[in-house]
Design a protein with these regions (language model features):
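C-terminal hydrophobic helical "lid"/dimerization subdomain
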Residues: 219, 226, 242-246, 285, ...
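Glycine-rich beta-strand-centered segment in the early N-terminal region that forms part
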Residues: 5-20, 35-82, 122-124
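Glycine-rich cofactor phosphate-binding loops and adjacent beta1-alpha1 units
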Residues: 146-150, 178-179, 195-277, 316, ...
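NAD(P)H dinucleotide-binding glycine-rich loop of Rossmann-like/cofactor-binding domains
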Residues: 39, 78-157
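Mid-domain Rossmann-like dinucleotide-binding core that forms the NAD(H)/NADP(H) cofactor-binding site
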Residues: 125-210
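Residues in the short beta-alpha loop(s) of Rossmann-like NAD(P)-binding domains
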Residues: 189-190, 260, 284
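Residue-level marker of beta-strand positions
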Residues: 49-51, 69, 83, 110, ...
Length: 341
Protein backbone atom coordinates (compact mmCIF):
# COMPACT_ATOMS: atom_id res chain seq x y z
CA UNK A 1 0.00 0.00 0.00
CA UNK A 2 1.27 3.49 -0.85
CA UNK A 3 0.70 6.26 1.67
CA UNK A 4 1.87 9.89 1.71
CA UNK A 5 4.96 10.73 3.77
CA UNK A 6 3.60 12.02 7.10
CA UNK A 7 4.40 15.47 8.46
CA UNK A 8 5.69 15.48 12.07
CA UNK A 9 3.83 17.49 14.68
CA UNK A 10 5.56 19.97 17.02
CA UNK A 11 6.76 17.23 19.39
CA UNK A 12 7.33 14.53 16.80
CA UNK A 13 10.10 13.41 14.47
CA UNK A 14 9.89 11.98 10.97
CA UNK A 15 12.01 8.87 10.55
CA UNK A 16 13.40 7.01 7.58
CA UNK A 17 12.91 3.48 8.83
CA UNK A 18 15.83 1.07 8.72
CA UNK A 19 15.26 -2.21 10.59
CA UNK A 20 11.98 -3.69 11.83
CA UNK A 21 11.73 -7.09 13.49
CA UNK A 22 8.72 -9.34 13.03
CA UNK A 23 6.99 -10.27 16.28
CA UNK A 24 4.57 -13.09 16.93
CA UNK A 25 1.82 -10.52 17.46
CA UNK A 26 2.43 -9.15 13.95
CA UNK A 27 1.90 -12.63 12.52
CA UNK A 28 -1.21 -13.13 14.65
CA UNK A 29 -2.81 -9.88 13.43
CA UNK A 30 -1.86 -10.79 9.85
CA UNK A 31 -3.42 -14.25 10.12
CA UNK A 32 -6.38 -13.68 12.43
CA UNK A 33 -7.12 -9.94 12.42
CA UNK A 34 -7.31 -9.72 16.18
CA UNK A 35 -5.63 -10.46 19.49
CA UNK A 36 -8.15 -10.65 22.30
CA UNK A 37 -10.16 -7.44 22.40
CA UNK A 38 -7.89 -5.71 19.88
CA UNK A 39 -9.59 -6.14 16.50
CA UNK A 40 -8.29 -4.89 13.14
CA UNK A 41 -11.21 -3.05 11.54
CA UNK A 42 -9.31 -0.94 8.99
CA UNK A 43 -6.04 -1.51 7.11
CA UNK A 44 -3.23 -1.33 9.67
CA UNK A 45 0.54 -1.06 9.31
CA UNK A 46 2.30 -3.76 11.31
CA UNK A 47 5.65 -3.57 13.12
CA UNK A 48 6.77 -2.32 16.53
CA UNK A 49 10.37 -3.57 16.92
CA UNK A 50 12.08 -0.78 15.07
CA UNK A 51 14.87 1.70 14.48
CA UNK A 52 15.52 4.41 11.93
CA UNK A 53 17.12 7.76 11.12
CA UNK A 54 15.66 11.17 11.94
CA UNK A 55 15.11 13.20 8.77
CA UNK A 56 12.87 15.98 10.12
CA UNK A 57 12.02 17.31 13.58
CA UNK A 58 9.00 19.19 14.88
CA UNK A 59 9.27 22.77 16.10
CA UNK A 60 9.33 21.74 19.76
CA UNK A 61 12.01 19.04 19.48
CA UNK A 62 15.41 20.02 20.87
CA UNK A 63 17.17 16.74 21.79
CA UNK A 64 17.19 15.18 18.32
CA UNK A 65 18.30 16.42 14.90
CA UNK A 66 18.26 15.13 11.32
CA UNK A 67 20.81 12.36 10.88
CA UNK A 68 20.42 10.94 14.39
CA UNK A 69 20.00 7.17 14.51
CA UNK A 70 17.27 6.19 16.97
CA UNK A 71 15.47 3.26 18.53
CA UNK A 72 11.71 3.59 18.83
CA UNK A 73 9.75 2.80 21.98
CA UNK A 74 6.34 1.85 20.54
CA UNK A 75 4.20 2.75 23.56
CA UNK A 76 3.44 6.47 23.98
CA UNK A 77 1.06 7.70 26.72
CA UNK A 78 -1.71 9.94 25.45
CA UNK A 79 -2.41 11.57 28.82
CA UNK A 80 -0.78 12.13 32.21
CA UNK A 81 -3.01 9.70 34.13
CA UNK A 82 -2.38 7.98 37.48
CA UNK A 83 -0.27 5.28 35.85
CA UNK A 84 2.02 7.77 34.14
CA UNK A 85 2.41 9.73 37.38
CA UNK A 86 3.70 6.62 39.14
CA UNK A 87 6.04 5.63 36.30
CA UNK A 88 3.96 2.70 35.07
CA UNK A 89 2.78 4.26 31.84
CA UNK A 90 2.59 0.84 30.17
CA UNK A 91 -0.63 0.27 32.13
CA UNK A 92 -2.34 3.43 30.87
CA UNK A 93 -5.61 2.32 29.23
CA UNK A 94 -5.38 5.05 26.58
CA UNK A 95 -1.74 4.49 25.57
CA UNK A 96 -0.78 4.62 21.89
CA UNK A 97 1.04 1.45 20.85
CA UNK A 98 2.46 0.71 17.42
CA UNK A 99 0.60 -1.98 15.49
CA UNK A 100 -2.16 -2.36 18.05
CA UNK A 101 -5.57 -1.53 16.57
CA UNK A 102 -6.38 1.16 15.69
CA UNK A 103 -2.78 2.47 15.86
CA UNK A 104 -0.46 1.93 12.90
CA UNK A 105 2.96 0.38 13.32
CA UNK A 106 6.24 1.30 11.67
CA UNK A 107 6.88 -1.38 9.04
CA UNK A 108 7.14 1.23 6.30
CA UNK A 109 9.61 3.56 4.58
CA UNK A 110 8.76 6.69 6.57
CA UNK A 111 7.16 7.00 9.96
CA UNK A 112 6.49 9.78 12.46
CA UNK A 113 6.67 9.22 16.21
CA UNK A 114 6.77 11.09 19.50
CA UNK A 115 10.28 12.50 19.87
CA UNK A 116 10.26 11.73 23.60
CA UNK A 117 10.02 8.02 22.79
CA UNK A 118 12.82 7.98 20.22
CA UNK A 119 16.21 7.25 21.77
CA UNK A 120 19.51 8.16 20.14
CA UNK A 121 21.72 5.16 19.45
CA UNK A 122 25.45 5.28 20.28
CA UNK A 123 27.78 4.83 17.33
CA UNK A 124 28.68 1.28 18.42
CA UNK A 125 25.05 0.09 18.50
CA UNK A 126 23.64 -1.07 15.16
CA UNK A 127 20.18 -0.42 13.77
CA UNK A 128 19.28 -4.07 14.28
CA UNK A 129 20.37 -3.93 17.90
CA UNK A 130 18.22 -0.82 18.22
CA UNK A 131 15.21 -2.70 16.84
CA UNK A 132 15.89 -5.59 19.22
CA UNK A 133 15.62 -3.27 22.22
CA UNK A 134 11.87 -3.92 22.07
CA UNK A 135 12.01 -7.67 22.81
CA UNK A 136 15.01 -7.08 25.07
CA UNK A 137 12.83 -4.68 27.07
CA UNK A 138 10.35 -7.48 27.70
CA UNK A 139 13.18 -9.48 29.27
CA UNK A 140 14.36 -6.53 31.35
CA UNK A 141 10.86 -5.81 32.63
CA UNK A 142 10.14 -9.49 33.34
CA UNK A 143 13.38 -10.11 35.22
CA UNK A 144 12.92 -6.93 37.26
CA UNK A 145 9.38 -7.98 38.15
CA UNK A 146 10.71 -11.43 39.04
CA UNK A 147 13.39 -10.04 41.32
CA UNK A 148 16.34 -11.72 39.60
CA UNK A 149 19.51 -10.91 41.51
CA UNK A 150 22.99 -12.21 42.27
CA UNK A 151 22.90 -15.97 42.73
CA UNK A 152 19.32 -16.51 41.56
CA UNK A 153 18.39 -19.88 40.12
CA UNK A 154 16.03 -19.27 37.22
CA UNK A 155 13.80 -21.55 35.15
CA UNK A 156 12.80 -20.13 31.75
CA UNK A 157 9.85 -22.03 30.33
CA UNK A 158 9.78 -22.09 26.53
CA UNK A 159 7.68 -24.14 24.11
CA UNK A 160 5.89 -27.14 25.60
CA UNK A 161 3.18 -29.19 23.85
CA UNK A 162 2.99 -26.60 21.07
CA UNK A 163 5.81 -25.76 18.67
CA UNK A 164 6.05 -21.97 18.60
CA UNK A 165 8.83 -19.48 18.04
CA UNK A 166 9.84 -17.79 21.29
CA UNK A 167 12.66 -15.23 21.00
CA UNK A 168 11.26 -13.78 24.25
CA UNK A 169 12.57 -16.82 26.10
CA UNK A 170 16.06 -16.14 24.77
CA UNK A 171 16.09 -12.49 25.82
CA UNK A 172 15.01 -13.54 29.30
CA UNK A 173 18.02 -15.86 29.42
CA UNK A 174 20.28 -12.99 28.35
CA UNK A 175 18.88 -10.58 30.92
CA UNK A 176 18.74 -13.07 33.80
CA UNK A 177 22.42 -13.92 33.33
CA UNK A 178 23.35 -10.25 33.06
CA UNK A 179 21.46 -9.49 36.30
CA UNK A 180 23.50 -12.07 38.17
CA UNK A 181 21.57 -15.33 37.95
CA UNK A 182 23.88 -18.16 38.99
CA UNK A 183 22.05 -20.80 36.98
CA UNK A 184 19.46 -20.62 34.19
CA UNK A 185 17.67 -23.72 32.90
CA UNK A 186 15.48 -23.61 29.77
CA UNK A 187 12.83 -26.01 28.50
CA UNK A 188 11.68 -26.22 24.89
CA UNK A 189 10.40 -28.65 22.28
CA UNK A 190 13.03 -27.65 19.74
CA UNK A 191 16.61 -28.90 19.95
CA UNK A 192 17.78 -26.05 17.69
CA UNK A 193 16.23 -23.40 19.93
CA UNK A 194 17.73 -25.07 22.99
CA UNK A 195 21.12 -24.90 21.28
CA UNK A 196 20.53 -21.19 20.68
CA UNK A 197 19.62 -20.83 24.37
CA UNK A 198 22.98 -22.39 25.29
CA UNK A 199 24.72 -19.98 22.92
CA UNK A 200 23.20 -16.95 24.64
CA UNK A 201 23.98 -18.12 28.16
CA UNK A 202 21.66 -20.87 29.40
CA UNK A 203 23.50 -23.23 31.76
CA UNK A 204 21.17 -26.20 31.28
CA UNK A 205 18.50 -27.16 28.77
CA UNK A 206 15.72 -29.74 28.81
CA UNK A 207 14.03 -30.91 25.63
CA UNK A 208 10.44 -31.70 26.52
CA UNK A 209 7.87 -33.65 24.55
CA UNK A 210 4.79 -35.08 26.24
CA UNK A 211 5.71 -34.93 29.92
CA UNK A 212 3.14 -33.87 32.50
CA UNK A 213 3.67 -30.51 34.23
CA UNK A 214 4.75 -32.36 37.38
CA UNK A 215 7.28 -34.37 35.39
CA UNK A 216 8.72 -31.21 33.85
CA UNK A 217 9.02 -29.66 37.31
CA UNK A 218 10.74 -32.79 38.59
CA UNK A 219 13.25 -32.71 35.72
CA UNK A 220 14.07 -29.06 36.45
CA UNK A 221 14.63 -29.80 40.14
CA UNK A 222 16.77 -32.86 39.40
CA UNK A 223 18.94 -30.93 36.96
CA UNK A 224 19.45 -27.95 39.29
CA UNK A 225 19.73 -30.00 42.45
CA UNK A 226 17.02 -27.80 43.94
CA UNK A 227 13.86 -25.95 42.94
CA UNK A 228 14.46 -22.56 41.26
CA UNK A 229 13.53 -19.42 43.17
CA UNK A 230 12.27 -17.81 39.96
CA UNK A 231 10.34 -19.11 36.97
CA UNK A 232 9.79 -17.00 33.85
CA UNK A 233 6.95 -18.51 31.81
CA UNK A 234 7.17 -17.37 28.19
CA UNK A 235 4.41 -19.26 26.37
CA UNK A 236 1.02 -18.65 27.98
CA UNK A 237 0.24 -22.35 27.49
CA UNK A 238 -1.83 -23.82 30.33
CA UNK A 239 0.47 -26.80 30.89
CA UNK A 240 3.51 -24.50 31.01
CA UNK A 241 1.91 -22.29 33.65
CA UNK A 242 1.09 -25.40 35.66
CA UNK A 243 4.68 -26.62 35.34
CA UNK A 244 5.89 -23.18 36.41
CA UNK A 245 3.90 -23.35 39.63
CA UNK A 246 5.02 -26.88 40.45
CA UNK A 247 8.65 -26.07 39.64
CA UNK A 248 9.04 -22.86 41.64
CA UNK A 249 10.48 -23.13 45.12
CA UNK A 250 8.24 -22.26 48.07
CA UNK A 251 8.45 -18.52 48.65
CA UNK A 252 9.61 -17.98 45.07
CA UNK A 253 8.17 -16.05 42.15
CA UNK A 254 6.51 -17.07 38.89
CA UNK A 255 6.32 -14.35 36.25
CA UNK A 256 3.87 -14.80 33.38
CA UNK A 257 5.28 -13.30 30.19
CA UNK A 258 3.50 -15.26 27.46
CA UNK A 259 -0.19 -14.58 26.86
CA UNK A 260 -2.55 -17.42 26.03
CA UNK A 261 -6.27 -18.02 26.59
CA UNK A 262 -8.07 -15.69 28.98
CA UNK A 263 -9.13 -18.60 31.20
CA UNK A 264 -6.71 -21.36 32.26
CA UNK A 265 -6.82 -24.06 34.92
CA UNK A 266 -3.88 -23.89 37.32
CA UNK A 267 -3.02 -25.45 40.71
CA UNK A 268 -3.58 -22.18 42.55
CA UNK A 269 -3.84 -23.82 45.98
CA UNK A 270 -0.44 -25.42 45.46
CA UNK A 271 0.95 -21.93 44.83
CA UNK A 272 -0.97 -20.38 47.72
CA UNK A 273 0.07 -22.79 50.47
CA UNK A 274 3.71 -22.54 49.36
CA UNK A 275 3.58 -18.74 49.03
CA UNK A 276 4.62 -18.79 45.39
CA UNK A 277 4.03 -15.26 44.12
CA UNK A 278 2.47 -15.11 40.65
CA UNK A 279 3.17 -11.85 38.83
CA UNK A 280 2.18 -10.65 35.40
CA UNK A 281 3.87 -8.26 33.02
CA UNK A 282 2.36 -6.07 30.33
CA UNK A 283 4.87 -4.94 27.76
CA UNK A 284 7.46 -2.78 29.61
CA UNK A 285 8.24 0.70 30.89
CA UNK A 286 11.40 2.74 31.55
CA UNK A 287 13.62 0.19 29.81
CA UNK A 288 15.05 1.84 26.67
CA UNK A 289 17.85 3.85 28.37
CA UNK A 290 18.89 0.76 30.35
CA UNK A 291 18.86 -1.45 27.26
CA UNK A 292 20.90 1.04 25.22
CA UNK A 293 23.50 1.27 27.98
CA UNK A 294 23.76 -2.53 28.15
CA UNK A 295 24.17 -2.83 24.39
CA UNK A 296 26.71 0.00 24.17
CA UNK A 297 28.79 -1.49 26.99
CA UNK A 298 28.56 -4.95 25.37
CA UNK A 299 27.14 -6.42 28.56
CA UNK A 300 24.45 -8.03 26.40
CA UNK A 301 24.78 -9.35 22.85
CA UNK A 302 21.52 -9.66 20.92
CA UNK A 303 23.11 -9.98 17.48
CA UNK A 304 22.88 -13.82 17.42
CA UNK A 305 19.09 -13.57 17.64
CA UNK A 306 18.80 -12.28 14.06
CA UNK A 307 18.76 -15.31 11.77
CA UNK A 308 16.92 -14.03 8.68
CA UNK A 309 16.90 -10.71 6.82
CA UNK A 310 14.58 -9.56 4.03
CA UNK A 311 14.14 -6.28 2.15
CA UNK A 312 10.77 -4.62 2.70
CA UNK A 313 9.70 -5.69 -0.80
CA UNK A 314 9.82 -9.30 0.40
CA UNK A 315 7.73 -8.71 3.52
CA UNK A 316 5.30 -11.50 2.66
CA UNK A 317 8.15 -14.01 2.42
CA UNK A 318 9.51 -12.72 5.73
CA UNK A 319 6.14 -13.19 7.43
CA UNK A 320 5.78 -16.68 5.98
CA UNK A 321 9.24 -17.55 7.33
CA UNK A 322 8.24 -16.34 10.79
CA UNK A 323 4.92 -18.18 10.61
CA UNK A 324 6.73 -21.44 9.84
CA UNK A 325 8.86 -20.99 12.95
CA UNK A 326 12.15 -20.89 11.08
CA UNK A 327 15.14 -19.34 12.81
CA UNK A 328 14.72 -16.97 15.73
CA UNK A 329 14.26 -13.33 14.72
CA UNK A 330 13.35 -12.23 11.20
CA UNK A 331 14.41 -8.67 10.38
CA UNK A 332 12.96 -6.52 7.60
CA UNK A 333 15.18 -3.84 6.02
CA UNK A 334 13.15 -0.77 5.10
CA UNK A 335 15.83 1.52 3.64
CA UNK A 336 16.61 0.39 0.06
CA UNK A 337 19.89 2.34 0.14
CA UNK A 338 21.15 0.65 3.33
CA UNK A 339 20.53 -3.04 3.92
CA UNK A 340 23.31 -3.40 6.51
CA UNK A 341 22.64 -4.53 10.10
Amino acid sequence: ENRPIPEPGPNEVLLRMHSVGICGSDVHYWQHGRIGDFVVKDPMVLGHEASGTVIKVGSGVTHLKPGDRVAIEPGVPREMDEFCKTGRYNLSPTIFFCATPPDDGNLCRYYKHSASYCYKLPDNVTFEEGALIEPLSVGIHACKRAGVTLGSKVFVSGSYLVNILRPIGLVNVLVAKMMGAAVVVVTDLSASRLQKAKEVGADFTIQVKDETPQEVASKVEKLLGCMPEITVECTGVQACIQAGIYATRSGGTLVLVGLGPEMVTVPIVNAAVREVDIRGIFRYCNTWPVAIALLASKRINVKPLVTHRFPLEKALEAFETTKRGEGVKVMLKCDPSDQNP
